[in-house]
C-alpha cells in the first residue's frame, strides 16, 4: 500500500480525532487602526469554499490536490507509510495530519500551491524580459512555476507533519501508551525531513539563486515563527502578555511568509520586475493573514459549538479581547474559568464573545482582505485574477 492509498483508507479506521494533550507548537497576536470599507460579497461556507477552489483549479489546468503526488508516491515514502499504519488506533496527531491531506475542505492543504499557480497565470509572461519565451508554458503557466507550486506544497506539508510532534513531557494517561507517541514522533520527523529534502532538491533544479534564497528565507521564517509560538512554558502560556502587533509579526512568520515569498518567487521565475514581485508578495501575505484570522474566529461564531470545544488562547480574538479588557481583568477571567485545575473553555468563550475581541478580529481579517485586493489591482483583469479575488472574498465573509 503506497502513501496515497494509505491516506485514502485512514478515515475508515479513524473514528474520533482526539489528539494528545498538547503539541510542541501553538500561536499568538496587537492594536488595529481604522479598517476601512469592505469589498467582499461571497458567502463563507464549506460548500462555497469548495466551489471557489474547484473553479480556480479549472483555470490553472489540473487539481492541486495531486500536485505533490509524485513525491507522495515515491518508494521511500511508501516505506514510511507502512510504518504509519502501525499508528492506527493510537491518538498520535500524525494520523490526523495524514487524513487532512485527503479530506480537508476549509483549510485546503493545497491552497498555497493553487495561489502560486493563479498569480503566475494572472501576471503572465514578462512584457519587458523575453528570456523566458523558450520555457514550456501550459495554460498560461511556465513549467518552472508549476514546479515551484509543488515545492511550496511540499514545504507546507512537511511543516504540518513536523508540527504534529507530541511534547512527551505533557502527556497524560488518557493520551495512550508512551511508546506509541515516541514511535509516532520518530515517523513524523522522518517523513517531514523526507518531504523537505525533496523540496530542496526541486529548488536546486530550478537553477535560480534568488528563488532558492526566497524559499530558504521562508523556511527560516516558518521555524522562527513556530519557535515564538512555543517559547513559553505550559504553566504560563495561557497568560502571555502578547499584543496584536506582535501577534501579527509572529503570525506572518508562521503562516504568511511561505505563501508571500512563493508568490514573489513565481514572478521572479517569469522575470517580472521588482514592482510586480512586490505586489505578488503583498497579495500572498495579506491573503494568508486573512485566512489565519478567519480560522481563529470560527470557534466564536459557529452556531453549534460543543461545550468541550477548545480554542487557541493566543488566537486573534483572544489577544484582542485581552487588549481591550486589560491585563489584570484578563487574568481574573481566566482564574474564574478554572475548575479543578482545568480551564472551562465554554465559560471563557462566552466572556470573550461578550467583549470586542471577536468583532475586532473580523475587522482585522477584512482589513487584510482589502489589502490583498488592492495588490491585485496591479494585475490585468483575467479569469485568474478573478479567482484570486474570489478566494479573498471566501475567507473574509462571516455570514
Curated annotation (Swiss-Prot):
Encoding gene (name): PDSS2
Reaction equations catalysed: 7 isopentenyl diphosphate + (2E,6E)-farnesyl diphosphate = all-trans-decaprenyl diphosphate + 7 diphosphate; 6 isopentenyl diphosphate + (2E,6E)-farnesyl diphosphate = all-trans-nonaprenyl diphosphate + 6 diphosphate
Subcellular location(s) of the protein: Mitochondrion
Name used for this protein in its record: All trans-polyprenyl-diphosphate synthase PDSS2
GO cellular component entries: cytosol; heterotetrameric polyprenyl diphosphate synthase complex; mitochondrial matrix; mitochondrion; polyprenyl diphosphate synthase complex; ubiquinone biosynthesis complex
Keyword vocabulary terms for this entry: Disease variant, Isoprene biosynthesis, Lipid metabolism, Mitochondrion, Primary mitochondrial disease, Transferase, Ubiquinone biosynthesis
GO biological process: cerebellum development; isoprenoid biosynthetic process; regulation of body fluid levels; ubiquinone biosynthetic process
Gene source species: Homo sapiens
Subunit structure: Heterotetramer composed of 2 PDSS1/DPS1 and 2 PDSS2/DLP1 subunits.
